[in-house]
Amino acid sequence: MPDAFCRDWTSEMGANYSMSKKRHEELKKIISEHDHNYHVLDKPTITDYEYDQLFAELLDIEKNPKGLDLSDSPSQRVGGTVLEGFTKAQHRLPMLSLANSYSPEDIFEFDERVRKFLNTEDPVEYLCELKFDGLSMELIYENGQLVRAITRGDGTVGEDVTHNIKTIKSIPLKLSHKNPPPLLEVRGEVLMFKEDFARLNETQQENGQQTFANPRNAAAGTVRQLDSRIAASRPLRFFGYALGAVEGETFNTQKNIQEYFNDHGIPTVLPYKEDLLVVAKGPEEVVKYYHHIEKVRPKLPFDIDGVVIKVNSLRLQEDLGLVARSPRWATAAKFKPEQAQTTVEDIVVQVGRTGALTPVAIMKPVKVGGVTVTNATLHNQDEITRKDIRIGDTVIIQRAGDVIPEVVEVVNPDKRPADRLPYSIPERCPACDSVAVKAEGEVVTRCVNPLCIAVVKESLKHFVARRAMNIDKVGDRLIETLVDNKLLTRFSDFYRLTKEQILSLERQGDKSADNIIKSIENSKNPTLARFIFALGIRFVGEQTGKHLADHFLTIDKFLEASEEELLQVPEIGAKVAKSIRDWTGNPKLVDEVKAMIELGVKIAGPVRAQEGSLSGMSFLITGTLPVKRDDAKDLIERNGGKILGSVSSKLNYLVVGDDPGSKVEKAQGLGVKIISWEELQAMI
């Protein structure tokens, strides 16, 4: 073949490749803009046919993907990834929960608290926005590229659902920003529009599949699918409203953040005409907004259950700080929940982990806010007596906070039959037949038998919970079965379970048994705070567990603490101190803790940063380690180290496991030291 021909042919191929690559970039941009116009602005500028032609051209070019950047291509939204399970992911900054209010009066009280804390009489400027009824989500952009999406989870650790979130067409895979920040965490809500939800349920019904109770359940269920093709087939939406961690950008107000999102392709409510987001000066304007949104709520294309009020100034937010897990500078003003009328068919009593007997009304099924309700809590005997609720009554029920069903009132109680007698909680525990006791000054009747089968089951369920020991493969049904088969009666029994014992149960296969044993094994390194919370001591919640861990530092010191010493712990009063001491003063319960330690449970106390062997050092993990990534992070933090979210000049060590990503190359370029899991352990 002549050299000249070869040169001409090669030159032509190179030119064609260059043109294809250029056209590919053009198509990505054009299609992404049309996606934004259609799915975010609801203002399509081309026909469906024209859009399909552009998409077909894109797919045709991508048949030969060599040299093409597919990471932000619209073709990546069609789904196809199928995961074996979800991986846990830690938020760089906690996703805090908000305090709730339910009336305009509460808004005035919130404003008064804010001004009092700031020591000012001047009106405070608030950003008022919608409280979406969806699934909270954090999108993480690195250098403008969407790299990860994490559910809220417990506020500290969520689940990585990137494979599904990338299928949502309103979410940009790449920010429309010429110089994107190195890191931008966008927080918002995944939801489903009412009209889309109705169509989805019609399709589900036509296909003989289970329908969803409401748009929120549909959105949450879709996001948690392991197969991203399912998510891609369902009409999910996203609205951004808050920041997580950010590098390379500064903001002065909450409104600035929303405007920034809107300007760079992240969906917000700003394009809507109904003034869904406003800046209000003083509580009067906030209340005006509250009533406005309450009025337009039925017309909105999506569900909301209230409004969120935030101090607009980020500097003032910093001054106000936090209270436990909630910011002082924000509150959620809920709307009155939807109600319905039904009949109380029976009243049954459930026994909780502290022995509390809780009456529950079994009702004729009725839909409230799109959800079929069949039972509602009656709280306690005083509540039943106050409302005079009897079996057979017609009642008004509502979903408190649009979630938990409760009985509001009895309809026409004066017209009920004479033989319909008042209801009284039984004097004996329905689970173990022990005498039930109502202590002086309390409204709750309790079973005081520590061996009550119901108390044991509920205590064990609490022990394995996500925020406690986090034994995620052991669910409520399995605990019921294990207890009924006398394989589980106390906490330490979890660590005595064998694969053979699990296989002896119905519907338990080899893989399932392996997963259960592995899950139990993985729970053996809890923090002291989690372990204390898991014990289920009355009045000791998650936050109190953290205070106790920070104060006593070791499990031994906690178990030995006197009431006087317990009273020195922040936010612990006489009642809580006595409850803790009653528990730690019981030799059988203390022996149970010792038994768990002997069975391999290693309880890690909090380490002061200056005391840790890794103090002052920053770490990032990439690839698969011999242990769970969250456990590795806990190990680093317990020894004073700090976890960073991305490779930067601030990073000291990149811990590399199997199949590492592109972070290794970036770290090498910045001169960051790269170490193995074994080298990290040696440093500790």
Swiss-Prot record:
Class in the EC hierarchy, top level: ligase
Reactions accelerated catalytically: NAD(+) + (deoxyribonucleotide)n-3'-hydroxyl + 5'-phospho-(deoxyribonucleotide)m = (deoxyribonucleotide)n+m + AMP + beta-nicotinamide D-nucleotide
Cofactors (names): Mg(2+); Mn(2+)
Binding site for NAD(+): 48-52, 97-98, 129, 152, 189, 310, 334
Annotated protein name in UniProt: DNA ligase
Organism in which the protein naturally occurs: Bdellovibrio bacteriovorus (strain ATCC 15356 / DSM 50701 / NCIMB 9529 / HD100)
Domain BRCT: 609-684
Membership in a protein family: Belongs to the NAD-dependent DNA ligase family. LigA subfamily.
Described function: DNA ligase that catalyzes the formation of phosphodiester linkages between 5'-phosphoryl and 3'-hydroxyl groups in double-stranded DNA using NAD as a coenzyme and as the energy source for the reaction. It is essential for DNA replication and repair of damaged DNA.
Binding positions (Zn(2+)): 429, 432, 447, 452
Organism ancestry: Bacteria, Pseudomonadati, Bdellovibrionota, Bdellovibrionia, Bdellovibrionales
Pfam assignment, any one: HHH_2
Keywords tagged on the record: DNA damage, DNA repair, DNA replication, Ligase, Magnesium, Manganese, Metal-binding, NAD, Zinc
GO BP, sorted A to Z: DNA repair; DNA replication
Gene Ontology terms: cellular component: cytosol
Protein EC: 6.5.1.2
Cited CDD domains: BRCT_DNA_ligase_like (cd17748), LIGANc (cd00114)
Gene Ontology MF terms: DNA binding; DNA ligase (NAD+) activity; metal ion binding
Catalytic residue list: 131
